[in-house]
Amino acid sequence: MSFLPIDLRMIGKIRLFYINKTSISHSITTKNISLIKNKDNLRYLLEILDITKESKKYLEKENLVKFAKMIDKSWELKKRYQESFIDYKECNSLIDYAKNNGAYCGKLLGAGMRGFVMIIGPENKLNNITDKIKYRSLSPKFVMTNQPIIKL
């Protein structure tokens, strides 16, 4: 594993939106495990793994736009992989609105189908998006230490 230092200016370009719902992650995980047995579904997961490795390179170079494009690509694959048992309508509405208003990408965070949606984009665009939607937003905050922030 290696550590990535993060330029804190990038943090202002990330916003989390709480969609105020919960799910039972155990049942989602069980369904995911059963899907892996299908070779087409396994292909999606391997493709997401490749995208993750490529994303790390863009993050190391602090190229947030290309990093966000990789996040977007992996999110689209994940939705196809899980479309048989997860309804992403609410998340997609928020992500589509954000992308149509200048965000680079959006992605659901956490297990299951509810919780936080991460949106990445220019700070001024995120501020406008935040002002116009109904969800509570959070900006990530970090405490400065001598330790790297992300461990991969």
What is the predicted role of each segment?
Residues 1-107, 118-152:
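C-terminal nucleotide
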Residues 111-112:
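Long, low-complexity C-terminal extensions of enzymes
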Residues 115:
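Conserved glycine-rich beta-strand-loop-beta hairpin in the small C-terminal domain of fold type I
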